[in-house]
A protein has these predicted regions:
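Generic structural signal for well-ordered beta-strand positions
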Residues: 26, 50, 66, 92, ...
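A motif-centric feature for acidic-aromatic and gly/ser/thr-rich catalytic loops and repeats
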Residues: 40, 133, 137-151, 157-234, ...
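Short consensus segments that form the blades of beta-propeller domains
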Residues: 73, 101-104, 261-263
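Short, low-complexity export/processing leader segments characterized by acidic and small residues
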Residues: 202-206, 235-245, 249-295
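Secreted, short cysteine-rich peptides and small extracellular cysteine-rich domains stabilized by multiple disulfide
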Residues: 293-346
């Protein structure tokens, strides 16, 4: 493969062998896009990504992503996706196109119906042409044990798909971080979809008849298949690069964190996803990352163990929160999060008998 002079499409064939008598073989061939090296990333004056090795990005005056369009590869692979927003900044419409014989053809055009209370949480999707129902969603308590404490992560209870081979209601199952793991058909009780992710949310495998029909996957956020973006409420995230496409909209928080990281000898990138450490940091809305910790425990560590530094206390908290997923001892409840969130209950060591 030579991508020094331009981007290339690489054909990849996966072969699966199950030993037996006879052996069972299954192969699948796909193509993967590889950008030119070095890849040039172009940003506008507001820090929004406007072009990379494959896509061109358009933004409105409020720094909201309005269009993503292919700029590299064979014409048959060109895609375009557009979004519209309401006065509150919620996405209200998504239109997807493919390039066919030099003409952009609409392949999907849906309107989003959002919950009036919880920002950006979709409860239904309508066909933009005739307003017929495409999908509907039922939400409950998220991983914080409340309706919105974790930004809806792990809060989708079931979805109903109105047409196609996977039509029907599907219950949602999660992994420990609130990522959608499997779907179970409410009619047959069998698994209808399964998802596997990399450490930064990149999709490793999607299987089952309903896998593509369900847009809510990593962090229970909407995924867009053409561009491989994850659409958080306030920003778009690219799992393939592990970066946001725009700067943190909470400028004051970003500036404070930038100063803090510089004092500690590190440089914080405002578009890096969870400080490039999605195991010990999380971001539920696309606003600002936070540290995986139980603040009340950290405060108690400092209060009861004055000889520990604050840094040592936080390091202990990282460990205790991770251990708590396996140690379900009775004690003070607290919500902690990784790239999304997880619920754990544990006593600090100085309160254990």
């Amino acid at each position: 493969m030579n991508n020094a002079t331009g981007s290339v499409w690489v054909v990849i064939t996966n072969l699966r062998v199950v030993r037996g008598n006879p052996d069972r073989l299954q192969s699948e061939t796909r193509s993967a896009f590889v950008a030119q090296t070095p890849e040039l990333l172009i940003h506008d004056a507001d820090g929004n990504l406007v072009r990379d090795g494959r896509w061109m990005y358009s933004w409105d005056a409020e720094n909201r992503l309005t269009r993503v369009m292919s700029v590299a590869g064979p014409l048959s692979s060109f895609r375009r996706v557009e979004w519209k927003y309401d006065a509150w900044g919620r996405r209200t419409r998504q239109t997807s196109y493919v390039l066919s014989n030099g003409v952009w053809q609409v392949v999907e055009d849906v309107k989003f119906v959002s919950d009036p209370v919880f920002f950006g949480r979709h409860v239904a999707e309508l066909n933009a042409t005739n307003n017929s129902l495409v999908r509907s969603y039922v939400w409950g308590l998220d991983l914080s044990g409340t309706l919105d404490g974790a930004g809806g992560v792990g809060g989708l209870l079931w979805l109903t798909i109105n047409s196609g081979p996977s039509a029907g209601t599907h219950f949602v199952c999660y992994d420990g971080n609130g990522n959608v793991w499997t779907l179970v058909s409410a009619t047959t009780g069998t698994e209808s979809a399964r998802y596997e992710y990399g450490p930064f949310g990149e999709p490793l495998r999607l299987s089952g008849p309903a896998a593509r029909s369900n847009p809510f996957r990593f962090s229970t956020k909407r995924a867009e298949d053409f561009t491989a973006l994850v659409l958080y409420e306030y920003r778009a995230y690219s799992p393939t690069s592990g970066r946001w496409l725009s700067r943190d909209p909470v400028g004051e928080r970003s500036f404070k964190e930038l100063l803090r990281s510089q004092r500690g000898g590190a440089v914080l990138d405002e578009v890096a996803f969870c400080r490039n450490d999605a195991v010990r940091h999380y971001d539920v809305l696309g606003l600002a990352w936070d540290v995986v910790k139980c603040q009340s425990w950290c405060d108690e560590v400092v209060r009861y163990c004055n000889f520990w530094s604050r840094k040592r206390a936080l390091e202990w908290c990282y460990t205790c929160c991770l251990d708590a997923m396996e140690d379900k001892a009775q004690g003070k409840a607290c919500v902690v999060a990784t790239a999304t969130a997880c619920l754990c209950v544990r006593k600090p060591p100085w309160k254990r008998k």
